[in-house]
């Protein structure tokens, strides 16, 4: 009986800690598939979201402020630049210091979908489920 409790506790801790660590290079293709079916020329959200990652001007503004770069909204149509923009955005907002825990794939997807605090918003859960399905 004494061994059952520690083994049960170990199983519980492992089950609770199965969230996958953030790997932006693996996450971006899944985001792209969900956002636009990998269409680099896509325009969505009534003309406000551009490219395969459906990047808004607000994201461009944040990235330029963070890095001092001069991305234009039209750069979102360039797949290489779109990836750079996404990586910069997530590397700034999806950090252990900011979130209070090690960033996960879920955090990254939900921040991409819902903004800097998207990881807390119920409205981003269904988006995460779509991204998670693409990651499998």
What residues fall within each predicted segment?
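Short, functionally critical alpha-helical segments immediately adjacent to catalytic or ligand/cofactor-binding
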Residues: 23-39, 55, 86, 107-116
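Sec-dependent signal peptide recognition
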Residues: 2-9
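Signal peptide cleavage region of secreted peptide precursors
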Residues: 18-21
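Short, solvent-exposed loop/turn and secondary-structure capping segments
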Residues: 42-44, 122-124
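Post-signal-peptide N-terminal segment of Sec-exported extracytoplasmic proteins
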Residues: 43-54
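Alpha-helical segment that forms one wall of the substrate-binding/catalytic cleft
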Residues: 57-119, 128-136
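A short, acidic/glycine-rich surface segment
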Residues: 39-42, 96-97
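C-terminal motif of bacterial Sec signal peptides marking the signal peptidase cleavage site
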Residues: 14-15
């Amino acid at each position: 009986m004494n061994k059952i409790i520690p083994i049960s506790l170990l199983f519980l801790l492992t089950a609770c800690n199965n969230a996958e660590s953030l790997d932006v290079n693996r996450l971006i293709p899944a985001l792209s598939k969900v956002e636009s079916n990998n269409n680099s020329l896509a325009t969505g959200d009534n003309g406000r979201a551009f490219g395969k990652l459906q990047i808004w001007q607000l994201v461009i503004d944040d990235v330029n402020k963070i890095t001092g770069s001069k991305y234009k909204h039209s750069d979102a149509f360039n797949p290489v630049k779109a990836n750079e923009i996404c990586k910069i955005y997530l590397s700034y907002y999806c950090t252990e210091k900011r979130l209070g825990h090690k960033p996960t794939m879920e955090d990254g997807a939900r921040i991409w979908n819902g903004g800097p605090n998207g990881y807390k918003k119920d409205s981003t859960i269904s988006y995460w489920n779509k991204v998670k399905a693409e990651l499998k």
